[in-house]
C-alpha cells in the first residue's frame, strides 16, 4: 500500500478540485504519474506538482494526506470507495460527496456540503462545518443514505436535508432547520438548535441534548421517556439513549408522519 502526501505550496486564490486524487486510484501509480495529474482550477487546469509538493511512501493502508490545506481546496474524497484521507487544515466545499466507503478526517474547519449524498464510510470534521452537512443535491429529494458524519464543533443550516439513512452527529450547536425533509436516518445534536428542527420531516429521528430555541408547532407531544431505545424501522435493533427526554412525533404538515424528535428535558422544560 502507498500513502500519498501532498503539501500545499502556498496560498490558493482560485479553487482547486481534488476529485481525481483518491486513495484507491493512486495505488498503482508512480510519483511521476501522480505529479502529472491535471486538476481543475477555476476555468483552467493545473498539474498536481504545480500546487503541491508531492511525496509517496509505503503505508499499511491506502492513504492520502493533505497538509496546509485551505477552503479553496474542494471536492476532496468525492466518490471515494476505500482507504483513508487525512486533511491537516481547513477543507473546501463538497468533501466526501457521494462517498461509498473509507474514512476522511479533517483537522480543521469545513465549508458547506460535507458528505453530500453520502452512501457509506465515515467523515470526521475536527472543527466546524458550514451549511448542508449530509444533504441532497440541489433539486434532488434523495439525500445521504448511509455512513456516518461527525462534526466536533458547530454546524450551519439545513444539515441532513432529505436524509434517508446513516447517522449525523454534531457535538456543538447548529443553525436552523436540521433534518428538513428528513425521511430516515438519525441526527444527534449535543448542543443547541436555533430552531425549526425536522421541518417537513417524514421518517427518521432527531435527538437534541441542548436547547431547541424555536420549536415547530406542527410536532405532537408524545410524553416523557427515560433511556429510550430509538428504532428507525421494525427490523432496526435500535439506538439506546441515556437520560430523560421529551418525545415528539411529526412533522404533521405531512400526512401520517413517522418522524421522531427527542429533546433532553433538562434543557427544554419550556416545551412541555
From Swiss-Prot:
Pathway: One-carbon metabolism; methanogenesis from CO(2); 5,10-methenyl-5,6,7,8-tetrahydromethanopterin from CO(2): step 1/3. Residues 77-210 are annotated as: 7 X 13 AA repeats of [GW]-X-X-[MLP]-X-X-G-X-[IL]-X-[IV]-X-G. SUPFAM superfamilies: Alpha subunit of glutamate synthase, C-terminal domain. One of its GO terms (biological process) is methanogenesis, from carbon dioxide. Gene3D superfamilies: Glutamate synthase, alpha subunit, C-terminal domain. Its EC number is 1.2.7.12. Sequence repeats lie at residues 77-89, 96-108, 115-127, 141-153, 160-172, 179-191, 198-210. GO terms for molecular function: formylmethanofuran dehydrogenase activity; transition metal ion binding. Keywords: Methanogenesis, Oxidoreductase, Repeat. The keyword Phosphoprotein does not apply. It comes from the Archaea. It catalyses: N-formylmethanofuran + 2 oxidized [2Fe-2S]-[ferredoxin] + H2O = methanofuran + 2 reduced [2Fe-2S]-[ferredoxin] + CO2 + H(+). The keyword Repeat applies. Catalyzes the reversible oxidation of CO(2) and methanofuran (MFR) to N-formylmethanofuran (CHO-MFR). This enzyme is oxygen-labile. Belongs to the FwdC/FmdC family. This enzyme is composed of seven subunits fwdA (65 kDa), fwdB (53 kDa), fwdC (31 kDa), fwdD (15 kDa), fwdE, fwdF and fwdG. NCBIfam families: FMH_DH_FwdC (NF042910), one_C_dehyd_C (TIGR03122). This is Tungsten-containing formylmethanofuran dehydrogenase 2 subunit C. It comes from Methanococcus maripaludis (strain DSM 14266 / JCM 13030 / NBRC 101832 / S2 / LL).
Amino acid at each position: 500500500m502507498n500513502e500519498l502526501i501532498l503539501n500545499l505550496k502556498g496560498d490558493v486564490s482560485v479553487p482547486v478540485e481534488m476529485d481525481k486524487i483518491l486513495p484507491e486510484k493512486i495505488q498503482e501509480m508512480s510519483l511521476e504519474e501522480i505529479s502529472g495529474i491535471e486538476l481543475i482550477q477555476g476555468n483552467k487546469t493545473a498539474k498536481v506538482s504545480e500546487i503541491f509538493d508531492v511525496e509517496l511512501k509505503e503505508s499499511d493502508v491506502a492513504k492520502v494526506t493533505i497538509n496546509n490545506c485551505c477552503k479553496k481546496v474542494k471536492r476532496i474524497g468525492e466518490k471515494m470507495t476505500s482507504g483513508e484521507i487525512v486533511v491537516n487544515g481547513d477543507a473546501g466545499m463538497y468533501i466526501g460527496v457521494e462517498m461509498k466507503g473509507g474514512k476522511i478526517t479533517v483537522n480543521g474547519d469545513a465549508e458547506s456540503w460535507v458528505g453530500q449524498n453520502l452512501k457509506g464510510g465515515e467523515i470526521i470534521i475536527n472543527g466546524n462545518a458550514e451549511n448542508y452537512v449530509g444533504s441532497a443535491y440541489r433539486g434532488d429529494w434523495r439525500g445521504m443514505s448511509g455512513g456516518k458524519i461527525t462534526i466536533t464543533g458547530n454546524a450551519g443550516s439545513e444539515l441532513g436535508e432529505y436524509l434517508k439513512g446513516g447517522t449525523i452527529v454534531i457535538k456543538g450547536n447548529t443553525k436552523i432547520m436540521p433534518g428538513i425533509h428528513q425521511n430516515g436516518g438519525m441526527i444527534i445534536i449535543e448542543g443547541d438548535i436555533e430552531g425549526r428542527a425536522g421541518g417537513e420531516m417524514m421518517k427518521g429521528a432527531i435527538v437534541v441534548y441542548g436547547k431547541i430555541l424555536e420549536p415547530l408547532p406542527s410536532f405532537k407531544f408524545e410524553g416523557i421517556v427515560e433511556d429510550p431505545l430509538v428504532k428507525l424501522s421494525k427490523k432496526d435493533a435500535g439506538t439506546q439513549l441515556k437520560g430523560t427526554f421529551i418525545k415528539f412525533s411529526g412533522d404533521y404538515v405531512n400526512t401520517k408522519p413517522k418522524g421522531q424528535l427527542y429533546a433532553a428535558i433538562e434543557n427544554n422544560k419550556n416545551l412541555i
